[in-house]
Amino acid sequence: PPIPGVENVDYWTHRDALDNKEVPASLTIVGGGVIGMEFASFFTSLGVQVTVVEMLDEILGGMDKELSAMLRAEYAKKGIKFLLSTKVVEVSKGETGITVSYENADGAGTVTADKLLMSVGRRPVTKGFGLENLNLEWTERRCIKVDEHLQSSVPGVYVCGDLNGVSLLAHTAVREAEVAVHHITGKEDAMSYRAIPGVVYTNPEIAGVGMSEEALQAAGIPYRAVKLPMAYSGRFVAENEGVNGVCKVLAAEDGTVLGAHMLGNPASELIVLAGMAIEDGK
């Protein structure tokens, strides 16, 4: 990432964090997205003092904002410090650890920890394959444009996964590959992204499928939101003592499900059912 001083410190990527053999006493995570929050959850459970620095005004950008705030509150109770709407301006190595200098509405500040995890996203590899020799149409974010069959602007060239930049999820790439093979072999099929679930494996889990309230509001689509506390489930209460959980369903005026978002440890299992309802038009 283009942060002054980052090239001079031995920071972690998510792969480094997984390969690490020792538990640090403290950890700063730059980036409060999916990967950042999953590692924050993991290291907090090991007793590590974690600080999350996020440029946006809420963690988990792209997920339901209300539920993301609820998850953040749960982890604040567990001791994670969050610095939101905060820009990292410099990284340096000192005798007491790695120091991250930042700026936000409260002014300038620093946070020092034993380890630094950079979780600000990854870029797909686009060089070294000869792609520059093809007359491919690219997006502004250097991803390859595709149609509903995953075919690029060059007939016979199909692009699945992160390189098309639509949905950076492994299960999405599997479905995209299926659609591409069907098109190549003459079977009727087309890619739809409206009901692809996403899960953040924190504790509690948070999951979503379909449109969020923010997306519906931005698109000017009328909807109603129905929220049901997970506390209505005896199993949830038994397994998640003291934890807030909620299931939020977003529906059109005729009752068609447009999106569903859940906070609570059954979320990764239940979200698939919500996706089925969206795909079926119920």
Describe the role of every protein-language-model region.
Residues 18-19, 24-28, 34-109, 166-174, ...:
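Rossmann-like dinucleotide-binding cores of NAD(P)H-dependent redox enzymes
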Residues 1-2, 37-38, 126-128, 167, ...:
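Glycine/Thr-rich phosphate-binding loops of Rossmann-like dinucleotide-binding domains
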Residues 7-24, 110-183:
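FAD-site-proximal beta/loop scaffold in flavoenzymes
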Residues 1, 29-30, 50, 111-121, ...:
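Short hydrophobic core segments
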Residues 48, 80, 136, 221, ...:
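Short phosphate-binding/catalytic loops that engage adenosine nucleotides
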Residues 13-15, 84-86, 92, 140, ...:
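Short loop/edge segments at beta-strand edges and connector loops
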Residues 185, 202-212, 217-282:
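Flexible, glycine-rich terminal cap/loop adjacent to redox cofactors
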